[in-house]
């Protein structure tokens, strides 16, 4: 319901890399699961309403790490590799990486 409401106003939702947001089970806290979150969001809202909202907070110390394969900003590309693996086009990945958010900020 919230995703649809944001879609209907032309907004975007950023996927969050914090392991507790990705999955309650530690072994499922992965870049692949994060991509599945994005796929669900795209199914509900359309990929033009999905963005990166990673919130890398590893500098806060233990307990604030990202999910496996996305522990810090140097691994952000793993999310996009996973999006490609599950069928997102190059144009959709580029939109999620930057274009969707830039559109809303304009």
Task: Annotate each PLM feature.
Residues 1, 26-28, 68-69:
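Glycine-rich tight-turn/loop motif centered on a GG-T
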Residues 15-17, 45-69:
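Short acidic/histidine-rich active-site segments
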Residues 21-36:
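Active-site glycine- and acidic-residue-rich loops that bind
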Residues 71-106:
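Mid-to-C-terminal alpha-helical segments outside catalytic/metal-binding sites
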């Amino acid at each position: 319901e919230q995703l649809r409401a944001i879609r209907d106003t032309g907004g975007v939702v950023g996927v969050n890399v914090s392991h507790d947001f990705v999955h309650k089970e530690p072994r499922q806290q992965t870049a692949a699961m994060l991509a599945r979150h994005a796929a669900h969001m795209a199914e509900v809202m359309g990929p033009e309403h999905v963005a990166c909202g990673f919130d890398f907070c590893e500098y806060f110390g233990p307990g604030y790490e990202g999910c496996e394969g996305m522990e810090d900003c140097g691994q952000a590309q793993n999310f996009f590799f996973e999006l490609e693996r599950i069928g997102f086009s190059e144009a959709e990945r580029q939109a999620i990486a930057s274009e969707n958010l830039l559109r809303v900020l304009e």
